[in-house]
Amino acid sequence: MTAISDCFAALRSQGRCALIPFLTAGDPDLETTRQALLALDREGADLIELGVPYSDPLADGPVIQAAATRALQAGTRLDDVLALLKDVRSQIKAPIVLFTYCNPILNRGFEAFLDQIAAAGANGLVVPDLPLEESQRLSEVAAERGIDLILLIAPTSSADRIAAISKQARGFIYLVSVTGVTGMRQGMQSRVADLLQEIRQGTDKPIGVGFGISGAEQARQVRDWGADGVIVGSAFVNRLQEQGVEGVATLCRELRQAIDRQPVLS
């Protein structure tokens, strides 16, 4: 068992859904990131996804792209993110999942990269541009260090691909709720509910849904569809830019209350 699987097992035993906020490290600066991470943990985040700023973030929408640009302009690099994580790790009970792209991993080499993020206290890793066909080796090396490589399923994934990803996935399965890049959407695709059922037919691994969840109503809807986790990114990045750390804390409380609220039986 890993920290992430333990977290989901505990939540499942309580009949609760995980809240998984996302922040871009170093936006607007590393000290603000530190305070925001502590606030998220304090206000009920079950896991926290921390984005490593990257110059060509293909999977990210305009909000997170802009956050990455601000962080890079402020001088934030991977080593800075890892130093921050190592420093703050003992103060945060929630598992931390790093979100990065292939290039930084390839530049350092699988083993060196994973040694470094493990030493910093990372529990999971999301690499959105990593092809499934090339993920097995990285997943194995990560698992040796207690790190779960989180794999993504898209609305366009075929049944065979869903089965292959579900089999190989560690920690939880990241279900992308909409096609395209990250960002807030006004409406969620009902295809997500069908995909959740389809994935569940082949695995009992936890499923987190992300991309496009902007507020309490959507988060509750995703929970009601049967997701084990709700991943919220652009809304937190926006809130941090507009209202600072206190705004992030308020949004976390709102989402926590929304997904913990029991559905009304008709």
From Swiss-Prot:
Gene3D superfamilies cross-referenced by the UniProt entry: Aldolase class I
GO cellular component terms, A-Z: cytosol
UniProt keyword ATP-binding, yes or no: no
Keywords attached to this entry: Amino-acid biosynthesis, Aromatic amino acid biosynthesis, Lyase, Tryptophan biosynthesis
Gene name of this polypeptide: trpA
Entry similarity comment: Belongs to the TrpA family.
PANTHER family: TRYPTOPHAN SYNTHASE ALPHA CHAIN, CHLOROPLASTIC (PTHR43406:SF1), TRYPTOPHAN SYNTHASE, ALPHA CHAIN (PTHR43406)
Oligomer status and interactors: Tetramer of two alpha and two beta chains.
Active-site feature positions: E49 (proton acceptor), D60 (proton acceptor)
Enzyme Commission number(s) of this protein: 4.2.1.20
EC class of the enzyme, as a word: lyase
Reactions this protein catalyses: (1S,2R)-1-C-(indol-3-yl)glycerol 3-phosphate + L-serine = D-glyceraldehyde 3-phosphate + L-tryptophan + H2O
Protein known as: Tryptophan synthase alpha chain
Main function: The alpha subunit is responsible for the aldol cleavage of indoleglycerol phosphate to indole and glyceraldehyde 3-phosphate.
Top-rank taxon, per record: Bacteria
Pathway(s) of this molecule: Amino-acid biosynthesis; L-tryptophan biosynthesis; L-tryptophan from chorismate: step 5/5
Alphabetized GO MF terms: tryptophan synthase activity
A Pfam family: Trp_syntA
CDD domains: Tryptophan_synthase_alpha
